[in-house]
């Protein structure tokens, strides 16, 4: 079988292949099917996601929660583990102990009432929810499920995730049914996850390729250059350093790594760049190209030049010295914008937003409180500038009848209050 899903890099005339570049010997599985699932199962085995046992692949067997945790952690190259002390049903001696810890650390798995239920079969809606979390999928809405006979049976906690997979074309159902309450088989899950991850990139990187579908970079040090990805590019949990040079991504660039340093040179994202990890701050450097809007759902350090950033969850945005950001929109309470770089404007649509980047114009939306421009409070519906007095009427220069320059104290490096006290 030709390996269609492995990307290689041509360097100095040598072909460097990832570890999963060679097709698995399927003859070792005496129960390997010859039906609709064969291609997906073969790909899942080649990609290092699915393993058999005792000469059996057990395609029709039900996937357990522990097995799914193992597959997802392999797909994303997860290495860090969360403490499982709060879960009384996962013993350190169990084969899946490490995988369950990785899946929890990723934010893909969540338990309830002190239980992770590792040995229980996983339902289709549970599996779709885990995948939506891992791939950082959003959108679709409940209306997306109305075309399915059983779309209304989806659990409230799974609705958005299931809709996202349907909207993305990853789940189609059968005979007008999604069968959300049914347990998912190993073959069914292989079909879904191989449709969501077409290719993987290791530390050896890739050059000069066009890839159809989503690509996951799951090892640190990867360099991608001169290529087109017709889908999403996901920089996974253990990919600490990744560089892109002249790479066109028609979908999203998703940064999942907790300490990822992503360098984008003359590269583009057709939809957006999403920074989403539960475990630390990622760094993003942009030089040339067009990445559209960068959405931060976790702490982010920016260098280079970025037009627009949206802080969608409570997070800290740090703009490095020499870096520039056109505008920042904050929709999460308690978020902050700081650093020695420049930010032209911040729109604060949530409470308790703090901005300390010099000369940044900060606008507090109507009904919002606790917004700070430097050490000054910006009242609801008004605008202030870091280093100057807050103003009324939405302008950083309006609202004052004094002929004194609001910028004099900045140039003299004297605190605002002390400057005007001295004048009086």
What does each of the following model-derived ranges do?
Residues 2-38, 46-98, 105-126, 132-159, ...:
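Feature responds to low-complexity, polar/acidic, surface-exposed segments characteristic
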Residues 100-105, 109-116, 120-125, 129, ...:
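A generic tandem-repeat structural signature
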Residues 189-190:
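Short, structured beta-strand segments at or near domain termini in extracellular proteins/domains
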Residues 4, 19, 24, 46, ...:
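Intrinsic-disorder/low-complexity regions
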